[in-house]
Curated annotation (Swiss-Prot):
UniProt-listed CDD domains: AAK_NAGK-UC
Segments forming a coiled coil: none
Species for this entry: Pyrobaculum islandicum (strain DSM 4184 / JCM 9189 / GEO3)
A biological process from GO: arginine biosynthetic process via ornithine
Gene: lysZ
Protein's name according to its UniProt entry: Putative [LysW]-aminoadipate/[LysW]-glutamate kinase
Location of this chain's protein in the cell: Cytoplasm
Length: 261
């Protein structure tokens, strides 16, 4: 089994190359997608300014109040069905899901979160409608048909929750016993000193998370990759905008993170 996370940067720029490459993997893959850029665009059209929180360690996350959640669900549903429709046009039987459908992803709402404010002070604030994944119904995600999953979970109280897409992809990979987790974004991999780092151990990835050379979304990707690699899953961070991006990633391009080299 392979779990393929299609990042928002790919979804919003050009997801067609990923879709064209998917049919050969349809019998053994699960797709998780992002789409934060479309969420931001829709929020701004509605006069709502996107809000982000900075956490200790430099990680960031979207602050999701109820109005933002409504837009988040709309945007992710549009992306999900566009991917599914494109796959059907290629003759691939695909089923688009949120984590709420069939209860495939259950999460616990984060009531409070620790942030670093603009003055550099640590504060505890309301967590909004953001969740931490607590259960994956693995048997309902395995193909056939090819499942396309958006990063929306459901709580025990029936609340829809925004969950981190990279974390969701890792949780799915672990739950289904995937051998590989491919994270597709708009960069060629982890770039240090102007060059792609081809291989990392889980321990090396954890150390790099603390480095000033790694910023933004790559910090979170490396953190999740290290956790996944420790579980025996090979993680590949690669470019989703090139021709045949899945083939390219699995054939050695990008950054490969494993438990031990």
């Amino acid at each position: 089994m392979i779990v393929i996370k299609v990042g928002g940067s790919v979804v919003c720029k050009d997801v067609s190359k990923v879709i064209q490459n998917l049919p050969k993997y349809a019998d053994r893959a699960i797709i998780v997608h992002g789409g934060g850029c479309l969420v931001n665009e829709m929020l701004k059209r509605l006069g709502i300014e996107p809000k982000f929180l900075t956490h200790p360690g430099g990680l960031t996350s979207r602050y999701t109040d109820l109005e933002t959640l409504k837009v988040f669900v709309m945007a992710m549903s549009w992306i999900n069905k566009q991917i599914v429709a494109s796959l059907h046009a290629l003759g691939v039987e695909a089923l688009g899901l949120t984590g709420a459908d069939l209860g495939v992803v259950r999460a616990k709402r984060k009531e409070k979160v620790l942030i670093v404010d603009e003055r550099g002070r640590q504060r505890v604030v309301d967590g909004g409608y953001v969740g931490r994944v607590v259960h994956i119904a693995a048997d309902r995600l395995k193909p056939p048909p090819l499942k396309v999953l958006s990063p929306i979970a459901v709580s025990e109280k029936g609340e829809l929750l925004n969950v981190d897409g990279d974390q969701l992809a890792f949780d799915v990979a672990k739950a289904v016993g995937a051998r590989q987790l491919v994270l597709l974004s708009d960069v060629d991999g982890l770039i240090i000193g102007g060059r792609v780092v081809p291989h990392l151990t889980a321990e090396e990835a954890e150390e790099l998370v603390k480095s000033e050379e790694v910023r933004g979304g790559m910090k979170r990707k490396l953190l999740m990759a290290a956790e996944a690699a420790k579980s025996g899953i090979e993680v590949v961070i690669s470019n989703g905008l090139v021709e045949n991006p899945i083939d390219v990633a699995l054939n050695g391009s990008g950054t490969h993170i494993v438990k031990n080299l």
